[in-house]
């Protein structure tokens, strides 16, 4: 119990290592800072969409008529809820058992899955490569919100540009 109290009262602990100070809790402080409101700078939606659109692979994705009708019927608020749930369950965890294979690519399941591939929010490898958010660490709420924004913006553009 005394050790627990001692550890919980530490605000910052450093170890002197060969004359260099090493922060023993560097990753903890980074996560804590993000959880306490230190926000990551995210790329604008327009810039992200433009960059993703330059990829031959990413730009080949589009919603079919049935998926567009599903979006129109459900409304963007519901689609955004679905996207948030899918991101929370399939993209946000630090370790994903089948990372790189967890997002279906075929049409007819859900428009969010197609949008995930188009926006590189389909797996942690693509998310890291395209958006610079490292895998191996649970996504913060702001990182999850960024992914959801990318997905819903792509879907919005698909349904408005190609009604």
Q: Which positions does each model-derived feature cover?
A:
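Short, hydrophobic/amphipathic alpha-helical patches that form generic packing surfaces
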Residues: 3, 81-89, 125-129, 153
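Short Fe-S-cluster ligation motifs
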Residues: 146-163
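Immediate flanking context of iron-sulfur cluster ligation sites
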Residues: 99-119
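The feature represents the first ordered module of a protein
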Residues: 50-103
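Iron-sulfur (Fe-S) cluster-binding segments and ferredoxin-like electron-carrier domains
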Residues: 125-143
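N-terminal leader/targeting peptides and immediately adjacent processing regions
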Residues: 6-14, 19-63
């Amino acid at each position: 119990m005394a050790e627990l109290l001692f550890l919980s009262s530490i605000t910052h602990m450093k170890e002197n290592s060969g004359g260099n100070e090493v922060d023993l809790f560097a990753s903890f402080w980074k996560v804590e800072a993000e959880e306490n409101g230190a926000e990551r700078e995210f790329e604008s939606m327009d810039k992200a969409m433009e960059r993703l659109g330059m990829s031959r692979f990413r730009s080949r994705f589009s919603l079919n008529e049935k998926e567009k009708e599903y979006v129109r019927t459900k409304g963007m608020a519901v689609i955004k809820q679905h996207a948030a749930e899918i991101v929370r369950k399939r993209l946000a965890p630090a370790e994903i058992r089948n990372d790189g294979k967890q997002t279906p690519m075929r049409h007819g399941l859900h428009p969010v899955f197609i949008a995930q591939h188009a926006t590189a929010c389909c797996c942690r490898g693509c998310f890291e490569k395209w958006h610079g958010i490292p895998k191996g660490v649970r996504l913060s709420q702001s990182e999850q919100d960024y992914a959801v924004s990318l997905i819903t913006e792509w879907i919005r553009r698909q349904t408005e540009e190609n009604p």
